């Protein structure tokens, strides 16, 4: 949605795709615009054909269909492209959820057909179906099983962390995962905190994305193994230690006191340094999780890691 509007997916295509455009040689996953169906509820209309948006930039009308969303992601040069879906708000009546999920499944079939028609598998591009179902475990499981019949290369679990309590969120992830193939990647969209990620890995999740590391960095919050710290707090004004002693990376060269000074002076470098640190923290956490799984002690390791993180006395 956002890249389609600005700078435009045609511009990105002319620049050689996202990898060349931003000089990134790693994998790139793009969403379809389905989350904007949820987040821009006041600016869109949903029909069977697709979704009509009023641009948040200038109010211009924008129509995205299952077919066009695959074409947009082809132009972007994504490695993993998501199907168009409807992210359901919380709470929502069961009958409305059923109707929405049925449409999401029809859209998924149309996306899969267009994915094949465009020849994206031959280019090594993957497409993931997205499980929806609101807070209803039975609907989520049926949705997952129906998507599995479409035989996508991978599957996402969407519509979680949209206002529901954490225990319910974890139930939704578990119900969704129970209907998905064991030999395909499972991607939980839009989450979460370090403890949430570790709990969802135990439920069968493989991949995650979240704005949290950079969004909280903009508010001077750094993640550490002992919990998050808020560098706006005065107690860090003369703290010569790094953000934490384990994460490492470029940001570890600087003291908490210096980064707090940047925060208080409204220097953009503060956000950059904390963002780099937070992303590295999450990458390290996932690396340690993989190692624990390979060693066969994930349950013990994750319990100890969560306990340490949540027992922190740091000010949030």
Question: What residues fall within each predicted segment?
Answer:
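Generic secondary-structure signature for well-ordered alpha-helical cores
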Residues: 78, 109, 113-116, 178-181, ...
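Non-catalytic, usually N-terminal nucleic-acid engagement modules in DNA/RNA processing proteins
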Residues: 1-121, 229, 234-237, 264
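Glycine-rich phosphate/ribose-binding loops and adjacent secondary-structure elements
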Residues: 105, 114, 118, 122-243
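Short secondary-structure capping/turn micro-motifs that flank functional sites
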Residues: 4-5, 89-90, 163-164, 216-217, ...
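Glycine- and acidic
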Residues: 90-94, 98, 154-160, 268-271
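Conserved, mostly hydrophobic/aromatic
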Residues: 31, 73, 129, 147, ...
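C-terminal extensions of enzymes
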Residues: 85-92, 244-316
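A non-catalytic, amphipathic alpha-helix used as a structural packing/dimerization or gating element
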Residues: 68, 72, 76, 99, ...
């Amino acid at each position: 949605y956002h890249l389609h509007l600005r700078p435009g997916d045609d511009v990105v295509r002319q620049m050689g795709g996202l990898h060349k455009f931003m000089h990134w040689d790693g994998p790139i996953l793009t969403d379809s615009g389905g989350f904007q169906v949820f987040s821009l509820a006041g600016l869109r209309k949903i029909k069977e054909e697709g979704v009509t948006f009023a641009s948040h930039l200038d109010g211009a009308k924008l129509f995205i269909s299952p077919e066009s969303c695959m074409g947009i992601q082809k132009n972007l040069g994504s490695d993993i492209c998501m199907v168009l879906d409807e992210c359901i708000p919380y709470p929502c009546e069961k009958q409305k959820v059923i109707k929405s999920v049925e449409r999401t499944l029809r859209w998924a079939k149309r996306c899969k057909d267009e994915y094949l028609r465009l020849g994206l598998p031959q280019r090594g591009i993957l497409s993931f179906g997205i499980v929806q179902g609101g807070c209803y475990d039975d609907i989520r499981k049926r949705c997952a099983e129906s998507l599995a019949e479409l035989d996508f290369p991978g599957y996402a679990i969407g519509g979680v962390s949209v206002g529901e309590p954490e225990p319910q969120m974890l139930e939704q992830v578990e119900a969704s995962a129970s209907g998905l193939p064991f030999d395909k990647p499972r991607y939980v969209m839009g989450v979460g905190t370090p403890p949430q990620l570790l709990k969802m890995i135990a439920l069968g999740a493989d991949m995650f994305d979240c704005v949290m590391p950079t969004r909280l960095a903009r508010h001077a919050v750094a993640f550490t193994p002992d919990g998050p710290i808020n560098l706006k707090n005065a107690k860090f004004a003369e703290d010569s230690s790094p953000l934490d002693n384990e994460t490492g990376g470029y940001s570890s060269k600087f003291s908490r006191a210096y980064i707090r000074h940047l925060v208080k002076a409204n220097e953009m470098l503060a956000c950059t340094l904390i963002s780099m640190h937070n992303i590295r923290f999450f990458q390290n956490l996932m690396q340690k999780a993989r190692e624990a799984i390979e060693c066969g002690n994930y349950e013990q390791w994750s319990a100890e890691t969560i306990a340490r993180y949540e027992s922190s006395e740091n000010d949030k």
